[in-house]
UniProtKB/Swiss-Prot annotation:
InterPro entries: La_dom_prot, La_HTH, La_xRRM, LARP7_RRM1, LARP7_RRM2, Lupus_La, Nucleotide-bd_a/b_plait_sf, RBD_domain_sf. The lineage of its organism: Eukaryota, Metazoa, Chordata, Craniata, Vertebrata. Residues 238-251, 258-274, 284-293 have a biased composition (Polar residues). SMART domains: LA, RRM. Residues 218-327 are annotated as: Disordered. The keyword Oxidoreductase does not apply. Residues 425-538 form the xRRM domain. This is La-related protein 7. Residues 295-356 form a coiled coil. It is found in: Nucleus, Nucleoplasm. It comes from the Eukaryota.
Length: 555
């Protein structure tokens, strides 16, 4: 019987364990079913972005997208092209997910395969009232984004397009942007509501404040006055507290001196009291061994002095209290006025519980300012060009007399025109090879050393090379150097060798190849204002060098 009971208990335990295991598995399956990918927000973001790219406002400005649509016959574009854009890379690279997001779109339609999309309606003509619906914004932080601008300006109306110009090298914002609204009234509302430049901003729009790299324009410029007032109040309170603590800690003599400095009206009284106190001290020291009656008289006199001191303390404290009360009243009146101003500003410019110091004006006004700037720039450049021309016309040597017009014309007629040089002509026996077991000195040093015997045409040598070539003007000049090669070897340890035969022919081929490569290298072309400014900079550098030279007079 006991064995049967044990078996039944074991079977019951096993069945209970199995039930718990099954329950755990079912719970896990239920949890797995509940967990699903949250793509609702992603689908809406993808739809919003693609509809913006294919919208009328963007296609009138985006030449790349417009060219892709025009190149396709039926207007369809592969969805894979959109996945190459940076904005879409940040969202998703799944073509099926993009097609799923655009199923219910009102602007674009997807083909049956779900791989291509196109606009439902053809693109119309460009609207003519774009400038009147656009506002210009400046004094923006370096890290400004489209989302931030849309959040700020959407309080004034429906924002359809935002353009943030950036530098090509760093891709940082230039500090200004253009915001396009749906209607002209919304743009006018943005100008009235958000035009709040800070006090330290430049007076004329279009000139942006210089900020450090990746550093935003300070947004606490509006509350600067309040901060300054707060600082003033703090310093005044600190001074008053220090005076009170000092008066409590000082002894009686120090207290009298402080009252002299703080209250000029009581200066005479304090001086007389201090003199009396000193006299009484001397008397007390001289009459220490006197009778009890004298001591009683001295104590009564000292009491009088103490009473006078207490009266002075009361007067000084009353004056201080009056001054503090008057200062507090002034501060309260100033603060009330500031609060009223701040309330007005907040009511007019509050966007997301922050007052944003921006300069906002219509694009038409900005275009007028731009035209004014361009005309001023042209005028300045014309003046600079004229001054550069006048400087270049002046002769550098002032001892030369100016030629007459006839002489100059005759001179220009007689001078032959420069012909295009085809490079150095082949001459045998003019190339000398120079070698050394250590790096050779500079080109200038070698040219100066060899020019003592015969003139040098060119030194072909790079810094740090142990071998080089020197080209002379004639074979006779090269022979002179070769004859003196033992002297150079003793003096500088150089090995000089005259090239001939195949070695000479190869070196001449190398000269022609190097020259052609140098001529074929693209040069940086400077045109317009850049060219003019570079000329002006060269003239300034030359003038500075002339000014730095010492003037030496003959004895």
């Amino acid at each position: 019987m006991k064995v049967c009971q044990r078996k039944t208990i074991d079977t019951e335990k096993m069945s209970s364990v199995g039930d718990t295991a099954c329950a755990d598995l079912s719970e896990k399956k239920d949890n797995e079913k509940k967990k699903r990918s949250r793509v609702k927000q992603l689908l809406s973001d993808v739809k919003k972005q693609v509809e913006f790219w294919f919208g009328d406002v963007n296609l009138h400005k985006d030449r790349f997208m417009k060219s892709i649509i025009e190149q396709s016959r039926d207007g369809y574009i592969d969805i894979a092209v959109l996945t190459t854009f940076n904005r879409m890379k940040n969202l998703t690279a799944d073509v099926k997910l993009i097609a799923r997001a655009l199923k219910n779109s009102t602007i674009v339609e997807v083909n049956d395969e779900g791989t291509r999309i196109r606009r439902k309606e053809p693109l119309g003509e460009t609207p003519k009232d774009v400038d009147s619906r656009t506002v210009y914004v400046e004094l923006l932080p370096k890290t400004v984004t489209h989302i931030w601008l849309e959040r700020v300006f959407s309080k004034c109306g429906h924002v359809v397009y935002i353009s943030i110009p950036r530098y090509k090298s760093t891709r940082h914002s230039k500090g200004f942007a253009f915001v396009e609204f749906e209607t002209q009234e919304q743009a006018q509302k943005a100008v009235e509501m958000l035009n709040n430049p800070p006090e330290d901003a430049p007076r004329k729009p279009g000139i942006f404040p210089k900020t450090c790299r990746k550093k935003a324009v300070p947004f606490d410029a509006v509350t600067q006055d309040n901060d300054e007032d707060g600082k003033k109040k703090k310093t005044e309170l600190k001074n008053s507290t220090s005076e009170e603590t000092g008066s409590n800690n000082m002894d009686q003599d120090g207290m009298l001196e402080s009252t002299v400095t703080s209250e000029p009206n009581l200066a005479t009284l304090t001086s007389t009291v201090s003199k009396k106190a000193k006299k009484k001290r001397l008397r007390s020291q001289s009459f220490e061994a006197s009778s009890g009656e004298d001591q009683f008289e001295m104590s009564s006199k000292m009491r009088k002095v103490e009473e006078e001191k207490s009266e002075l303390k009361d007067l000084s404290s009353e004056n201080k209290d009056e001054e503090l009360n008057s200062l507090k009243k002034k501060d309260d009146s100033v603060l009330k006025a500031k609060r009223k101003r701040k309330k007005k500003l907040k009511e007019r410019l509050k966007v997301g519980e922050e007052v944003i110091p921006l300069r906002v004006l219509s694009k038409k006004e900005w275009l007028d300012l731009k035209q004014e700037y361009l005309t001023l720039q042209k005028r300045c450049m014309a003046h600079l060009k004229q001054s550069v021309f006048q400087i270049n016309q002046k002769p550098t040597n002032y001892h030369i007399v100016k030629l007459k017009e006839d002489d100059t014309n005759a001179f220009y007629k007689d001078t032959p025109k420069k012909e295009l040089t085809s490079g150095p002509e082949f001459l045998s026996g003019v190339i000398v090879k120079i070698s050394y077991n250590q790096p050779l000195p500079s080109k200038r040093c070698i040219k100066d050393m060899l020019s003592e015997l015969s003139p040098v045409a060119y030194v072909d040598l790079l810094d740090g090379d142990t071998e080089g070539h020197v080209r002379f003007k004639s074979s006779e000049d090269a022979q002179k150097v070769i004859k003196a090669r033992f002297e150079f070897q003793k003096k500088y340890n150089w090995n000089l060798e005259l090239l001939s035969g195949d070695h000479e022919r190869r070196y001449w081929q190398k000269i022609l190849v190097d020259r052609q490569a140098k001529l074929n290298t693209p040069r940086e072309k400077k045109r317009g204002t850049e060219k003019l400014i570079s000329k002006a900079e060269k003239i300034i550098i030359a003038k500075a060098k002339e000014a730095s030279n010492h003037i030496r007079f003959d004895d």
